[in-house]
């Protein structure tokens, strides 16, 4: 029997990220979009189990893209919710919440502001749908800004934090003004979660836990 996944609860209320991300976006994004990825992932895994039992290799191959896309959507969104925290909460203060990560950012990018500029340029440079990520390259902790297409997840590095650049993440509130969404996301970024992921990655003990 195939493993099934369920929608994780948000670690805050749907209106907790206002005014940066409105309640309506959070409700639709979590209850509809994320749930759809999980529903489709479970269906694909069930079909995979059936195909495996029948030794149906062509069907197993056909299901790979569905599992990758919907599984990636589940991974990415599960990480994204934990990347966020209510505006002006202690978690959004990098000095208090992420001193180790802040020092690494400053050492590599010169300053937090220069890093934000570089990260923002990557987000706004995405064509179509995708994600922007700050990742750590395992032990040693070298930081890197990367983007992934559609729902491709980060699997070969430690995802410190990511930002959803699909239109469903911002369009109801920001319309086509992606720059304002990107500017606002820093106000609700959970630096404490980012710090934990970064430190675990440096120590070589990071596991992708949803």
Swiss-Prot record:
<dbReference type="InterPro" id="IPR019833">
    <property type="entry name" value="Mn/Fe_SOD_BS"/>
</dbReference>
<feature type="binding site">
    <location>
        <position position="164"/>
    </location>
    <ligand>
        <name>Mn(2+)</name>
    </ligand>
</feature>
<keyword id="KW-0479">Metal-binding</keyword>
<comment type="subunit">
    <text>Homotetramer.</text>
</comment>
<keyword id="KW-0809">Transit peptide</keyword>
<dbReference type="Pfam" id="PF02777">
    <property type="entry name" value="Sod_Fe_C"/>
</dbReference>
<dbReference type="InterPro" id="IPR001189">
    <property type="entry name" value="Mn/Fe_SOD"/>
</dbReference>
<dbReference type="Pfam" id="PF00081">
    <property type="entry name" value="Sod_Fe_N"/>
</dbReference>
<keyword id="KW-0049">Antioxidant</keyword>
<feature type="binding site">
    <location>
        <position position="77"/>
    </location>
    <ligand>
        <name>Mn(2+)</name>
    </ligand>
</feature>
<feature type="binding site">
    <location>
        <position position="29"/>
    </location>
    <ligand>
        <name>Mn(2+)</name>
    </ligand>
</feature>
<feature type="binding site">
    <location>
        <position position="168"/>
    </location>
    <ligand>
        <name>Mn(2+)</name>
    </ligand>
</feature>
<protein>
    <recommendedName>
        <fullName>Superoxide dismutase [Mn], mitochondrial</fullName>
        <ecNumber>1.15.1.1</ecNumber>
    </recommendedName>
</protein>
<keyword id="KW-0560">Oxidoreductase</keyword>
<dbReference type="InterPro" id="IPR019832">
    <property type="entry name" value="Mn/Fe_SOD_C"/>
</dbReference>
<dbReference type="InterPro" id="IPR019831">
    <property type="entry name" value="Mn/Fe_SOD_N"/>
</dbReference>
<dbReference type="GO" id="GO:0005759">
    <property type="term" value="C:mitochondrial matrix"/>
</dbReference>
<dbReference type="InterPro" id="IPR036314">
    <property type="entry name" value="SOD_C_sf"/>
</dbReference>
<comment type="function">
    <text>Destroys superoxide anion radicals which are normally produced within the cells and which are toxic to biological systems.</text>
</comment>
<dbReference type="InterPro" id="IPR036324">
    <property type="entry name" value="Mn/Fe_SOD_N_sf"/>
</dbReference>
<keyword id="KW-0496">Mitochondrion</keyword>
<dbReference type="GO" id="GO:0030145">
    <property type="term" value="F:manganese ion binding"/>
</dbReference>
<comment type="similarity">
    <text>Belongs to the iron/manganese superoxide dismutase family.</text>
</comment>
<keyword id="KW-0464">Manganese</keyword>
<dbReference type="InterPro" id="IPR050265">
    <property type="entry name" value="Fe/Mn_Superoxide_Dismutase"/>
</dbReference>
<dbReference type="GO" id="GO:0004784">
    <property type="term" value="F:superoxide dismutase activity"/>
</dbReference>
């Amino acid at each position: 029997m195939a493993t099934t996944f369920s929608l994780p609860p948000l670690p805050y209320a749907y209106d907790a990220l206002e005014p940066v991300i409105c309640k309506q976006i959070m409700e639709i994004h979590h209850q509809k979009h994320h749930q759809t990825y999980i529903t489709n992932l479970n269906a694909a895994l069930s079909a995979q189990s059936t195909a495996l039992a029948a030794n149906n290799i062509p069907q197993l191959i056909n299901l790979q893209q569905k599992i990758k896309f919907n599984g990636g959507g589940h991974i990415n969104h599960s990480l994204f919710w934990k990347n966020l925290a209510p505006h002006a909460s202690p978690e959004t203060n990098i000095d208090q919440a992420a001193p180790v990560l802040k020092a690494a950012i400053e050492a590599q990018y010169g300053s937090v502001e220069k890093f934000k500029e570089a990260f923002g340029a990557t987000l706004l440079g995405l064509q179509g749908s995708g994600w922007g990520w700050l990742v750590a390259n395992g032990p040693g902790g070298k930081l890197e800004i990367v983007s992934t297409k559609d729902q491709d997840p980060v699997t070969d590095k430690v995802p410190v934090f990511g930002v959803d650049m699909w239109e469903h993440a911002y369009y109801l509130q920001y319309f086509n003004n992606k720059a304002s969404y990107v500017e606002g996301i820093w106000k609700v970024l959970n630096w404490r979660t980012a710090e934990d992921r970064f430190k675990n990655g440096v120590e070589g003990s990071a596991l992708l836990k949803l």
